[in-house]
UniProtKB/Swiss-Prot annotation:
It comes from the Bacteria. Keywords: Ribonucleoprotein, Ribosomal protein, RNA-binding, rRNA-binding. This is Large ribosomal subunit protein bL9. PROSITE patterns: RIBOSOMAL_L9. The keyword rRNA-binding applies. Binds to the 23S rRNA. InterPro entries: Ribosomal_bL9, Ribosomal_bL9/RNase_H1_N, Ribosomal_bL9_bac/chp, Ribosomal_bL9_C, Ribosomal_bL9_C_sf, Ribosomal_bL9_N, Ribosomal_bL9_N_sf. One of its GO terms (cellular component) is ribonucleoprotein complex. GO terms for biological process: translation.
């Protein structure tokens, strides 16, 4: 049976793809869970059109993110924090703190795009990846400076 996928399905395809699947798989799993609909001329053409629109939108977003990437790639952002003995921070530097430091330079960036791993808990320089879009991952340097 031919179906048009409504959502991404693991090991099958992405939303908008037209796939040939077993009748039972379509009737008992895909269609009841609204992951797919039975393919006919109307919804097949609509799915192809929607997929084209989504690709254009994604390409536009990637282009904008590449421009943003060029403006922040390799730059150093300094964050001043209070420290105690042995340059140990009171608290930690989080993705939100880094996003605010970047925002202060005039670049709007969502904190969820920062690949921090875990919060920074010491003074020094740290390389951080910014995941802007698929294939667009600039690196920034965060310099954590202690103040008494």
């Amino acid at each position: 049976m031919k179906v048009v996928l409504q959502k991404d399905v693991l090991n099958l395809g992405d939303a908008g793809d037209v796939k040939e699947v077993a009748d039972g798989y379509a009737r008992n799993f895909l269609i009841p869970r609204r992951l797919a609909v039975r393919a006919n001329d109307g919804n097949t053409k609509a799915a192809i059109h929607q997929k084209r629109l989504a690709e254009l939108k994604r390409d536009k977003r990637v282009k904008v993110m590449k421009e943003l990437s060029a403006s922040i790639d390799g730059k150093t952002y300094e964050i001043k924090v209070k420290v105690g003995e042995n340059d140990k921070l009171f608290g930690s530097v989080t993705a939100n703190d880094i996003a605010l430091a970047i925002k202060n330079t005039g670049v709007e960036l969502d904190k969820r795009k920062l690949d921090l791993g875990e919060p920074i808990k010491s003074v020094g320089e740290f390389k951080i990846k910014v995941r802007l879009a698929e294939g667009v991952v600039p690196g920034i340097i965060v310099k954590v400076v202690g103040q008494a």
